[in-house]
């Protein structure tokens, strides 16, 4: 598919000007004034600002939460449609490892949730709920084979997403060795649970 956007206002770090933008197979291939190219679709962007789509790096679609059957309200269809209406063209969601199971099982589940439903592009971080020493090689494989280079760990929500200090240390050490990224949900979940129960 090819797209020609005519007469749009383009703002860069150093310029502010009007031009045409030619897109082939979802890649911008030409920017210039009065482009003369054949395109399957043409959009007149006169008096309009042309900006790239936004990226939402933190979504939770169909996230199960706890034993009561609570699930976040948006699925991949409603969530990505809403994102597209707001100008977001990529989301990054969080497959959630079940305790005692492989991160690859979580990834497969999340791909199935997204399959055929997404209105926009998506990628993944990985929520880790436990990680024994023997499964640490999964982290390198996630990065190399699946492009997942960021992991989220929770210090909150005991019995749901909370990771113990051993898991926290093992995953942080491995991430440091391989140059991947850790996202922390940093609260004292044990103390919060005590306060809520008192």
Kindly give the residue locations of the regions a language model identified.
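Metal-associated gating/positioning segment near the N- to mid-region
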Residues: 45-117
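Histidine/acidic-residue-rich, glycine-tolerant segments that coordinate divalent metal ions
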Residues: 97-108, 113-198
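Histidine-rich, glycine-flanked metal-binding segment
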Residues: 1-4, 9-53, 67
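Divalent metal-coordination and catalytic microenvironments
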Residues: 8, 26, 47, 58, ...
């Amino acid at each position: 598919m090819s797209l020609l956007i005519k007469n749009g206002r383009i703002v860069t770090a150093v310029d502010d000007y009007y031009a045409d933008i030619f897109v082939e197979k979802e890649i911008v291939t030409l920017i210039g004034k009065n482009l003369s190219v054949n395109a399957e679709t043409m959009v007149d962007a006169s008096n309009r600002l042309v900006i790239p789509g936004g990226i939402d790096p933190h979504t939770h679609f169909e996230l199960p939460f706890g034993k009561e059957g609570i699930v976040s309200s948006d699925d991949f269809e409603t969530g990505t449609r809403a994102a597209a209406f707001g100008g977001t063209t990529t989301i990054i969601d969080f497959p959630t490892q079940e305790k005692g199971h492989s991160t690859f099982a979580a990834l497969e589940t999340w791909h199935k949730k997204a399959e055929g439903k997404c209105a926009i592009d998506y990628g993944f971080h990985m929520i880790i709920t436990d990680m024994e020493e023997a499964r640490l090689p999964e982290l390198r494989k996630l990065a190399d084979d699946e492009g997942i280079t960021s992991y989220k760990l929770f210090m909150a929500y005991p019995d749901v997403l909370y990771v113990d200090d051993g898991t926290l240390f093992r995953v942080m050490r491995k991430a440091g060795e391989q140059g991947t990224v850790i996202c922390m949900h940093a609260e004292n979940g044990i103390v919060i649970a005590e306060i809520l129960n008192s």
